[in-house]
C-alpha cells in the first residue's frame, strides 16, 4: 500500500466553508466542525492555484512559464499593512466589500498571509487562505472579497494581462458581461 501523493499547493493554499460569525474579518472563521474545501472544488469554481518559490520569484522558471502561457505581461507589488498602506483600516474594509472584476484577479503571495473569500454555487462563502508561495487566479466575474489575517500583513505580486486594470464592482453587478460569462461557465454549465 503506497502513500497518497500530497499536493504541495496545500501547504500554501487551504480553503474551508466559513461560519456566519460577525467577528473580526481577519479571524479564520471556521465552521464547527471544520469543513474543508479541496483545491479541485475551487478549480470547479474557476479558482486556479499554484505553489511557487517565493524566495526566488525573480528567477522562478515556473512563474515565467505561467506568465507566458496566460499572457501576464504586467507585474507589480502591493503591500497591505498599517505601515505601508495609507488609510489602512479604510482600505482593508473596502477590500472586504463583496465585489467582482471584469478581468482575472491574479495574486502571488511572496510574504505574509491573506484570505480570499469566494462564493460557491449555493452562495455559501469559502475562505481561501493564501500563504507565502501560494498563487491564485480568481476568474473574471466571480464575487469575492479579501482581507489580511490577524498578522495584518501580506505582500503580493499582482499580475495583469496588458495594462493594470483593477476596478471593483460591488455586488450586485449581475448585468455585467463578465458576470454573465462566469455564471454560464462555472455556475450553470458546471452543475448541469
From Swiss-Prot:
> One cellular component GO annotation, for this chain's record?
cytosol
Keywords per UniProt: Amino-acid biosynthesis, Cytoplasm, Dioxygenase, Iron, Metal-binding, Methionine biosynthesis, Nickel, Nucleus, Oxidoreductase
Question: What top-level branch of life does the organism fall under?
Answer: Eukaryota
Pfam families reported in the protein's UniProt record? ARD
Report the pathway entry: Amino-acid biosynthesis; L-methionine biosynthesis via salvage pathway; L-methionine from S-methyl-5-thio-alpha-D-ribose 1-phosphate: step 5/6
Q: How is the cofactor bound?
A: Binds either 1 Fe or Ni cation per monomer. Iron-binding promotes an acireductone dioxygenase reaction producing 2-keto-4-methylthiobutyrate, while nickel-binding promotes an acireductone dioxygenase reaction producing 3-(methylsulfanyl)propanoate.
Q: Where does Fe(2+) bind?
A: 99, 101, 105, 144
Q: Can you tell me which residues bind Ni(2+)? A: 99, 101, 105, 144
Give the E.C. number(s): 1.13.11.54, 1.13.11.53
List where in the cell it is found: Cytoplasm; Nucleus
Query: Do the record's keywords include Cell inner membrane?
Result: no
Required co-factors:
Fe(2+); Ni(2+)
UniProt GO molecular function:
acireductone dioxygenase (Ni2+-requiring) activity; acireductone dioxygenase [iron(II)-requiring] activity; iron ion binding; nickel cation binding
Q: Which InterPro entries match?
A: ARD (IPR004313), ARD_euk (IPR027496), RmlC-like_jellyroll (IPR014710), RmlC_Cupin_sf (IPR011051)
GO annotation terms (biological process): L-methionine salvage from methylthioadenosine; regulation of cell division
Reactions this protein catalyses: 1,2-dihydroxy-5-(methylsulfanyl)pent-1-en-3-one + O2 = 4-methylsulfanyl-2-oxobutanoate + formate + 2 H(+); 1,2-dihydroxy-5-(methylsulfanyl)pent-1-en-3-one + O2 = 3-(methylsulfanyl)propanoate + CO + formate + 2 H(+)
- What family does the Swiss-Prot or TrEMBL record give for this protein? Belongs to the acireductone dioxygenase (ARD) family.
Q: What is the documented function of this protein?
A: Catalyzes 2 different reactions between oxygen and the acireductone 1,2-dihydroxy-3-keto-5-methylthiopentene (DHK-MTPene) depending upon the metal bound in the active site. Fe-containing acireductone dioxygenase (Fe-ARD) produces formate and 2-keto-4-methylthiobutyrate (KMTB), the alpha-ketoacid precursor of methionine in the methionine recycle pathway. Ni-containing acireductone dioxygenase (Ni-ARD) produces methylthiopropionate, carbon monoxide and formate, and does not lie on the methionine recycle pathway.
Output the HAMAP family linked to this UniProt entry: Salvage_MtnD_euk (MF_03154)
Entry protein name: Acireductone dioxygenase 2
- This chain is encoded by the gene named ARD2
Amino acid at each position: 500500500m503506497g502513500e497518497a501523493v500530497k499536493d504541495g499547493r496545500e501547504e500554501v493554499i487551504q480553503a474551508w466553508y466559513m461560519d456566519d460569525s460577525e467577528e473580526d474579518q481577519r479571524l479564520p472563521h471556521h465552521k464547527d466542525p471544520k469543513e474543508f474545501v479541496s483545491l479541485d472544488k475551487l478549480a470547479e469554481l474557476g479558482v486556479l492555484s499554484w505553489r511557487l518559490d517565493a524566495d526566488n520569484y525573480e528567477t522562478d522558471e515556473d512563474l515565467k512559464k505561467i506568465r507566458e502561457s496566460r499572457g501576464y505581461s504586467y507585474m507589480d507589488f502591493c503591500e497591505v499593512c498599517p505601515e505601508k498602506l495609507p488609510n489602512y483600516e479604510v482600505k482593508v474594509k473596502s477590500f472586504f466589500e463583496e465585489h467582482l472584476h471584469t478581468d482575472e484577479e491574479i495574486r502571488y503571495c511572496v510574504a505574509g498571509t491573506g484570505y480570499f473569500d469566494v462564493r460557491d454555487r449555493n452562495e455559501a462563502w469559502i475562505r481561501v487562505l493564501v500563504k507565502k508561495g501560494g498563487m491564485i487566479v480568481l476568474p473574471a466575474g466571480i464575487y469575492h472579497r479579501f482581507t489580511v489575517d490577524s498578522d495584518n500583513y501580506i505582500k503580493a505580486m499582482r499580475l495583469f494581462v496588458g495594462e493594470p486594470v483593477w476596478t471593483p464592482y460591488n455586488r450586485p453587478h449581475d448585468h455585467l458581461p463578465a458576470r454573465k460569462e462566469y455564471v454560464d461557465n462555472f455556475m450553470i454549465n458546471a452543475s448541469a
